[in-house]
């Protein structure tokens, strides 16, 4: 199989689809890998590293897309849509429930698109989303602490406080991978942390995990309102695989927050959980202020720590990439149910129910679409 690794072109996206070690594994399995010039430089992998791993370095973006399978990090941007072709396997993060134009382009060009974030194991865990959720969760608490500083628009609060001064209050909505990792860092910074989740069993696990050092609260509209309005930092970390994020924090709740408080919307790439995060921001211009509250809505947070993120992502995605390359997509889907759940579009059909519902499109199961 011929495989392409393009350079990411999203604002300040410094990750790369595969590390040199990942490329080496594919080449050793008999596949041809084309890597776009400087694709890995943002993660401090140079062209020579890929060349030594057995890749062919190409300067033309069109050439790296003229392959059997493209492995990326983030969803293609509009300038990349012309490279789509029938039968192309696209393996990357997609978040299609918030990307109608991209979804339509994938359907029109009959691309076989596999979204990292919807590959799901029998225990409902998301193995290809998990490493980036860990990174984004940990970053969210660090970023929140930074933007609480007065010079960054915040109210000038130190999350850990000092003797005789109260700690900053952090509320985390969602107790999954991102929320759990946000909690770890917020606790490490010395904050007073509350985490809300809809699952009582998960709250029990979090209470055990953190030894009673966090407040675990059932997530419902009244509790969300109560804790949001008294918080200095609110982190949104709710995910429904493949579907748009639920808008759990209303504009009225935001209006009740203190001036200079901060919200971090980790779920912004799926539409966000705050009614007031009405636009996606970038690492170049990461925040805006609305109702006196600092809003951080960067969709590719892990892109700011690309070396760590690329290596973590490569560890998770490489076994699936090898499966697709070695077996071909039909046999890979047939033999691996978790991977088949990652299929979002197949030759003109939407094969993810959450995406179909988001845009009122016709849905076909993977089995129907592939006639397995």
Curated annotation (Swiss-Prot):
Catalytic activity: L-alanine + NAD(+) + H2O = pyruvate + NH4(+) + NADH + H(+)
Any GO CC annotation of this UniProt entry: plasma membrane
Keywords for this protein: NAD, Oxidoreductase
E.C. designation(s): 1.4.1.1
GO MF entries: alanine dehydrogenase activity
Binding site for NAD(+): 169-199
Pathway it works in: Amino-acid degradation; L-alanine degradation via dehydrogenase pathway; NH(3) and pyruvate from L-alanine: step 1/1
Enzyme active site: 95
Enzyme class: oxidoreductase
Domain of life of the source: Bacteria
Entry-linked Pfam families: AlaDh_PNT_C, AlaDh_PNT_N
One example of a Gene Ontology biological process annotation: L-alanine catabolic process
Role according to the record: May play a role in cell wall synthesis as L-alanine is an important constituent of the peptidoglycan layer.
Homology family: Belongs to the AlaDH/PNT family.
Protein name: Alanine dehydrogenase 2
Organism ancestry: Bacteria, Bacillati, Bacillota, Bacilli, Bacillales
């Amino acid at each position: 199989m011929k495989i392409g690794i393009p350079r990411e072109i999203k604002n300040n996206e410094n990750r790369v689809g595969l590390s040199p070690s990942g490329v080496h594994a594919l080449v050793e399995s008999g596949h041809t890998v084309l890597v776009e010039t400087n694709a890995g430089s943002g993660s401090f992998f140079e062209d020579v590293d890929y060349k030594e791993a057995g890749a062919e370095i190409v300067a033309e973006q069109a050439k790296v897309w003229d392959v059997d399978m493209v492995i990326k990090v983030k969803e293609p941007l509009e300038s990349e849509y012309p490279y789509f072709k029938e039968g192309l396997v696209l393996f990357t993060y997609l978040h299609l429930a918030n990307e109608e134009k991209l979804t339509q382009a994938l359907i029109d060009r009959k691309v076989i698109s596999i979204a990292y974030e919807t590959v799901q194991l029998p225990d409902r865990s998301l193995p290809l989303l998990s490493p980036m959720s860990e990174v984004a969760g940990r970053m969210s608490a660090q970023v929140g602490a930074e933007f609480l500083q007065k010079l960054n628009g915040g109210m000038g609060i130190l999350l850990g406080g000092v003797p005789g001064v109260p700690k900053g209050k952090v509320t985390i909505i969602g107790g999954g991978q991102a929320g759990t990792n946000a909690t770890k860092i917020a606790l490490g910074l010395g904050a007073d942390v509350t985490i809300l989740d809809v699952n009582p069993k998960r709250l029990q696990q979090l209470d055990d995990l953190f030894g009673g050092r966090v407040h675990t609260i059932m997530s419902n509209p009244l509790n969300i309102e109560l804790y949001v309005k008294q918080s200095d930092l609110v982190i949104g970390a709710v995910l429904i695989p493949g579907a748009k994020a639920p808008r759990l924090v209303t504009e009225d709740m935001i209006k009740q927050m203190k001036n200079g408080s901060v919200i971090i919307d980790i779920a912004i790439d799926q539409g966000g959980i705050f009614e007031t995060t009405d636009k996606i921001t970038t690492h170049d211009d990461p925040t805006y202020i609305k109702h006196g509250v600092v809003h951080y809505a960067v969709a590719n947070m892990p892109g700011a720590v690309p070396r760590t993120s690329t290596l973590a992502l490569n560890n998770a995605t490489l076994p699936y990439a090898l499966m697709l390359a070695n077996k071909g997509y039909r046999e890979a889907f047939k033999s691996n149910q978790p991977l088949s759940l990652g299929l979002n579009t197949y030759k003109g059909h939407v094969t993810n129910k959450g995406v179909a519902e988001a845009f009122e499109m016709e849905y076909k199961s993977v089995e129907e679409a592939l006639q397995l």
